[in-house]
Swiss-Prot record:
GO terms for cellular component: cytoplasm; endopeptidase Clp complex. Gene3D superfamilies: 2-enoyl-CoA Hydratase, Chain A, domain 1. Keywords: Cytoplasm, Hydrolase, Protease, Serine protease. This is ATP-dependent Clp protease proteolytic subunit. GO terms for molecular function: ATP-dependent peptidase activity; ATPase binding; serine-type endopeptidase activity. One of its GO terms (biological process) is protein quality control for misfolded or incompletely synthesized proteins. It is found in: Cytoplasm. Pfam families: CLP_protease (PF00574). Transmembrane segments: none annotated.
Amino acid sequence: MIHYPATAQSQFEAQGLGYIPMVIEQSGRGERSYDIYSRLLKERIIFLVGPVNDATANLVVAQLLFLEAENPDKDIYFYINSPGGSVTAGMGIYDTMQFVKPDVSTLCVGQAASMGALLLAAGAQGKRFCLPNSRVMIHQPLGGFQGQASDIEIHAKEILFLREKLNHILASHTGQPVEKIALDTDRDNFMSAEQSVAYGIVDKVIASRADAA
């Protein structure tokens, strides 16, 4: 599998997800309980937390499609706290973000590294945000393969193809030249929230909801 290498934290599953809080809502029909992520979904909020893999990508894609069906004219809010992960899984999320009719507003909460940074940049123009102490990191994809020389060559070509494609995607969303993207992603490139604004990954640093208005 070819993937964007995640940062060191991705060696572990996101902490604290073993227990998911439940929310109780009172209504005229009585009480109803939701897990916290389902309750956020009612507010059109999708939360990507932890590594990007096939399982998390399938959930995010399903939620994007559901929210589009619910109201195709109302924005979707995509919160990201991710060290990155699988390129193919991430591209599934990316393509769906571009496919759905509603604008997808992105917000970095904590970190958006590797594929997480690309998804952050892929939000609707003018609606991409970072919280003040967020960290963003971009770099080139990483792949490893063992086997016959001919198979290794095939996988090496695939990695180079994906690197070129990802560089063009990042360039299209940041406004940076592809050549600069290629240079800046040659090694891990960490940015503060303010630096990610200057680079074009996000549009604004916000400290409160009022700042996003």
